[in-house]
């Protein structure tokens, strides 16, 4: 098992499994599984995505293996702004983006076109995958948490905290 860059979990490239220090519903990216399959496959693991609710409200298609998930672009923006605004914990120390992540392109689970791997254009050093055809965003486990905990102004707070 090797550590995943900038994250707190590990990945075994041999068997494509992951080891997480917390449960799926014990982070800023708390996902509650509904038990329903989607008919789409995870772009990382090629296992069937499932329906879940992110932080008790937004429905996402997620992977039980790698804990990545797909959400539409507009919903992603709303989630990031809302959760950053509500966060009151300690900021993460800034870390640079791993340039290798920009070459790690995924296939959109909906249309099967290649997604665009690019830096998230907001706080946090995160590379996200976007589909220009479907307007979907793929987030690997922990990426939304890094955006939430990134230093900088928080929406709804004129003092930046």
Model-derived features: positions:
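Intrinsic N-terminal pre-sequences and regulatory tails
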Residues: 1-41, 156-161
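Short Cys/His-rich Zn2+-coordinating modules
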Residues: 20-29, 44-50, 85-96, 111-118
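Short, flexible, mixed-charge glycine/proline-rich loop motifs
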Residues: 1-6, 29-38, 52-57, 95-105, ...
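Residues immediately within or flanking Cys/His clusters that coordinate Zn2+
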Residues: 9, 39, 60, 68, ...
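Short, structured motif recognition centered on aromatic/hydrophobic residues
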Residues: 1, 11, 18-19, 69-71, ...
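Short cysteine-rich clusters marking metal-coordination/redox-active sites
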Residues: 12-15, 42-45, 63-66, 108-111, ...
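Short, intrinsically disordered terminal segments enriched in charged and Pro/Gly residues
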Residues: 25-33, 75-99, 148-161
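Short cysteine/histidine-rich zinc-coordinating motifs and their immediately flanking basic loops
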Residues: 6-13, 24-30, 54-60, 75-80, ...
